[in-house]
Regions:
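Metallo-beta-lactamase
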Residues: 2, 6-9, 13-17, 22-24, ...
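Extracellular/periplasmic metallocenter environments
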Residues: 88-91
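Active-site metal-binding motif and surrounding structural segment of the metallo-beta-lactamase
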Residues: 47-86
Length: 177
């Protein structure tokens, strides 16, 4: 993958994002970074922003689904990081019905949810579930997303779209009245 992402954008609480448009899939690809005193987690990473120091070790790299290889292997090599399906301090939330292996990650202390393709937040449509044509089972995905309505979600970081930095749960509830 050879993209030219913009700089890291900090969002507080250790979370940052970076993104770039990928002409091969005609979509804006977003990546999320979480940094703490225990190390760094990169969710669905695309190319690391040029001119930005590499993240602090230890580095854990997480794919939210089977389609998000992106720059995982390259960044694992550059940072001596580990590609992993688990993240200490985050709850893994499988979301059957989206793409293969779709799993979101919830960080309870900050009320932050990191999601791959199950929900997208792109103009001009705004927040919406993954379109049916990309789902393995659209009805099951909607059922999976409804389970999240019990979580105290404040912020949402996406693999496709601008983050929602407040009132995350309220935004999801509007999708499932």
């Amino acid at each position: 993958m050879s993209l030219s992402p913009g700089p890291l954008t900090p969002h507080g609480g250790g979370f940052s994002t970076w993104h770039a448009y990928d002409p091969s899939c005609k979509a804006e690809l977003w990546s999320t970074c979480f940094s703490s005193n225990q190390g760094t987690v990169l969710f669905d990473p695309i190319n690391w922003p040029k001119g930005t120091p590499l993240p602090a070790a230890p580095v854990r790299i997480v794919r939210t689904n089977g389609n998000h290889d992106r720059s995982c292997a390259e960044l694992a090599a550059r940072t001596e990081g580990q590609i992993s399906a688990t993240v200490p301090g985050f709850t893994a939330l499988p979301l059957p019905g989206a793409g293969e292996g779709e799993t979101a990650f919830f960080h309870l202390p900050s009320g932050t949810w990191v999601v791959g393709d199950a929900l997208i937040h792109l103009a001009p449509h705004g927040l919406m579930p993954l379109p049916d044509k990309y789902c393995t089972n659209p009805a099951l995905l909607r059922q999976s997303l409804r389970r999240l309505l019990d979580l105290p979600i404040r912020r949402i970081f996406f693999a496709h779209g601008d983050p929602i930095l407040q009132d995350g749960l309220e935004r999801i509830q509007k999708l499932f009245p």
